[in-house]
Amino acid sequence: MSLRVLNSVTPSLRGTVLVDKTALWKGRPEKSLVSSRVSSGGRNSRGVITVRHRGGGHRRLYRVVDFKRNKEGVPAVVKRLEYDPNRTAFLALIQYEDGELSYILAPSGLKVDDVIMSGAGSDVLPGNCLKLSMIPSGTFVHNVEMKVGGGGIIARAAGSYAQVMGRDGAYVMLRLGSGEVRRILSVCRATVGVVSNLDNRNIKLGKAGRSRWLGLRPKVRGVAMNPVDHPHGGGEGKTSGGRNSVTPWGVPTKGKKTRKRGKHSDKYIRVSSVKR
């Protein structure tokens, strides 16, 4: 996929850069693989805002994506590539030899009519799913499991990937996008390739309305608020905030370490992404 720079016919289109989706499916999603989705608007079960700057947006249907890829030894043909409003990556609709349909995350370079497969007999090609022990060092992978059979968790966003670094006994060393090197059980599955829509990081929405279509609400600066609403608020005239940047709850930002010390999973992290 490439980028599409819009002509400045109107002020809102000036500087707008979007991903070109002309090669994607233009019809409705597969009816058997969608379910209804109720937007939370950033609220919890009590109606309290737990995530700010969310709300509104276009109505969406949730596409049921197969993150486990546990149908081994059965080839599947890519029927079409689709846009998914619920994530930044594109989806691929695949059909197995027995007729079953499924959505998977589309890796970069996957095309319609390509044949993919999961399991021990699969080649190391984009879209094929194998155990980490069967993937050679240096290979880029995505949709990596952290628990055996639990489904892929690591590297699922557009353009993301992890790199197989080597073996460490029953584990495989993975370098994540953050620079962290982590040990994962070698029997966990991963899909070969980089997630599609690599140009997602380069888009420019161009206007506030396009953010609202995506369900994103305005982000008000703390220095523009009143003292009751934010530690940076208040003051006579325009101020700098008077202190180092903090969240509305007073927690320092811009470098503050948020991971708890002594977590059980620390033993699986060989190189941290945070420089101490």
Curated annotation (Swiss-Prot):
Entries under HAMAP family matching the protein: Ribosomal_uL2_B
Cross-referenced NCBIfam families: rplB_bact
InterPro entries: NA-bd_OB-fold, Rib_uL2_dom2, Ribosomal_uL2, Ribosomal_uL2_bac/org-type, Ribosomal_uL2_C, Ribosomal_uL2_CS, Ribosomal_uL2_dom3, Ribosomal_uL2_RNA-bd_dom
Record-stated family: Belongs to the universal ribosomal protein uL2 family.
Lineage: superkingdom: Bacteria
Compositionally biased residues, Basic residues: 254-264
Species per Swiss-Prot/TrEMBL record: Anaplasma phagocytophilum (strain HZ)
Protein name as it appears in the record: Large ribosomal subunit protein uL2
Keywords tagged on the record: Ribonucleoprotein, Ribosomal protein, RNA-binding, rRNA-binding
Pfam families: Ribosomal_L2 (PF00181), Ribosomal_L2_C (PF03947)
GO molecular function term, any single one: structural constituent of ribosome
